């Protein structure tokens, strides 16, 4: 639903960067929040009563592969390399454009229901994901997943596909669909491929997303090939900078972490996928001590198996507490920022905060549920009690995408029925 102005009336608002809980109205004009205070006496095109709800910034999924919902449950209880080589890649080679379209559309519906407004996606047939993104109404950063395996002919194909997507998104000129460069990983992309990506990042002023230090196998492969760490390789090609969003970062050394911090790069932490594939535990304590910008991602639903950032926040917090045997090791404020403000910082968006002048990316959580009450600590309620279905309303760039738990942009039942026809599992 496109509105010139929206007034959220009487909600419990998580206001500002310090997350002060306040009873207030929120006025949205265009794509921005223009006023947050009690009793706003101004007309609006849409007035929503949120007096029994918690009003929070919507979430940013900093790393996913949305069409992989098609592969949910396909390969279970196996490590990453076996998971990829024996199960995922063989099936992905059979996926058609329409499979990617319907799979991503289902994924976007799932993300919307858990309060996600923005996501970073790496896959193929990205034009189909762009189409689904515009239809559902979320905001996407889409990159073609480049893999050349040191094959010069394959590299040329990957470069052409990337250039084609860049031109497609540029021509699309959408406020919701953005381009991002997406080399798969240092172990699947040659040095020349990574160097080309670095050059295009500067030429196109483009962000870059990549898998980094996800497994010990990756570290071993890169050290045998280059005699250094994957982070050093990215530094050598000119990719280690503030435009980089590196997923996982499990096996980073202390020196790697210092370099990432100095460069202003972002780590997209994916705790559920990391645990499910037995890949390891991200060194969050050291990353935060070194002021690394840490965002949150779900990874694909094939290795998670959901796209629920609320669940991801809970896992991110609990995992660190038990690994360090210290319940104070990470604060709820830090975890919540990873799902909101830190992701916005990585993408260069003025979002992730409910305050005047910020993008009107807002999720409304219905508090009329036993497992959410009482709200003694709003952040604790969100991180440890809430689940995806608790999000009642989603506003993306001032547009109401979901209201009363019903998507206004697409026929959800039709998408689910259609998905059953194209599922390859």
Swiss-Prot record:
Protein EC: 3.5.4.28, 3.5.4.31
Top-rank taxon, per record: Archaea
Protein name: 5-methylthioadenosine/S-adenosylhomocysteine deaminase
CC cofactor: Zn(2+)
NCBIfam families: PRK08393.1
Known function: Catalyzes the deamination of 5-methylthioadenosine and S-adenosyl-L-homocysteine into 5-methylthioinosine and S-inosyl-L-homocysteine, respectively. Is also able to deaminate adenosine.
Keywords, in A-Z order: Hydrolase, Metal-binding, Zinc
Stated family: Belongs to the metallo-dependent hydrolases superfamily. MTA/SAH deaminase family.
Residues where Zn(2+) binds: 63, 65, 211, 299
Annotated binding of substrate, by residue: 92, 184, 214, 299
Cofactor descriptive note: Binds 1 zinc ion per subunit.
Keyword Iron: no
CDD domains: ATZ_TRZ_like
């Amino acid at each position: 639903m496109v509105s010139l102005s929206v007034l959220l009336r009487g909600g419990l608002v998580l206001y500002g960067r310090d997350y002060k809980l306040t009873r207030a109205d929120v006025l949205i004009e265009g794509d921005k929040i223009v006023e947050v205070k009690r009793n706003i006496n101004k007309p609006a095109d849409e007035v929503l009563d949120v007096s029994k709800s918690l009003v929070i910034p919507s979430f940013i999924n900093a790393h996913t592969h949305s069409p992989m919902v098609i592969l949910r449950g396909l390969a279970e209880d196996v490590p990453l390399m076996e998971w990829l080589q024996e199960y995922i890649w063989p099936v992905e080679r059979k996926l058609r454009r329409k499979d990617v379209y319907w799979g991503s559309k289902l994924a976007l519906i799932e993300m919307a229901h858990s309060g996600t407004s923005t996501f970073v996606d790496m896959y193929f047939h990205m034009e189909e994901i762009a189409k689904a993104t515009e239809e559902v109404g979320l905001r996407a950063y889409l990159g073609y997943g480049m893999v050349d395996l040191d094959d010069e002919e394959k590299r040329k194909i990957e470069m052409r596909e990337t250039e084609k997507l860049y031109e497609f998104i540029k021509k699309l000129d959408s406020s919701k669909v953005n381009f991002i460069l997406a080399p798969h990983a240092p172990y699947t992309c040659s040095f020349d491929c990574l160097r080309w990506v670095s050059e295009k990042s500067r030429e196109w002023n483009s962000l870059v997303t990549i898998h980094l230090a996800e497994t010990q196998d990756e570290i071993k492969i890169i050290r045998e090939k280059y005699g250094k760490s994957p982070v050093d390789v990215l530094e050598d090609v000119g990719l280690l900078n503030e435009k980089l969003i590196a997923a996982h970062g499990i096996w980073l050394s202390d020196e790697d972490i210092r370099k990432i911090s100095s460069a202003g790069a972002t780590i997209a932490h994916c705790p559920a996928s990391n645990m499910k594939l037995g890949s390891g535990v991200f060194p969050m304590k050291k990353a935060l001590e070194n002021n690394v910008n840490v965002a949150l991602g779900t990874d694909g639903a094939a290795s998670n198996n959901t796209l629920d950032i609320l669940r991801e926040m809970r896992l991110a917090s609990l995992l660190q507490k038990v690994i360090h045997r210290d319940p104070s090791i990470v604060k709820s404020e830090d975890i919540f920022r990873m799902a909101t403000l830190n992701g916005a910082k990585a993408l260069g968006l003025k979002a992730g905060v409910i305050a005047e002048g910020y993008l009107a990316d807002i999720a409304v959580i219905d508090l009329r549920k036993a497992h959410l009450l009482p709200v003694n600590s709003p952040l604790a309620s969100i991180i440890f009690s809430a689940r995806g279905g608790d999000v009642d309303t989603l506003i993306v760039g001032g547009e109401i995408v979901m209201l009363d738990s019903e998507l206004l942009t697409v026929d959800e039942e039709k998408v689910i029925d259609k998905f059953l026809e194209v599922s390859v599992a």
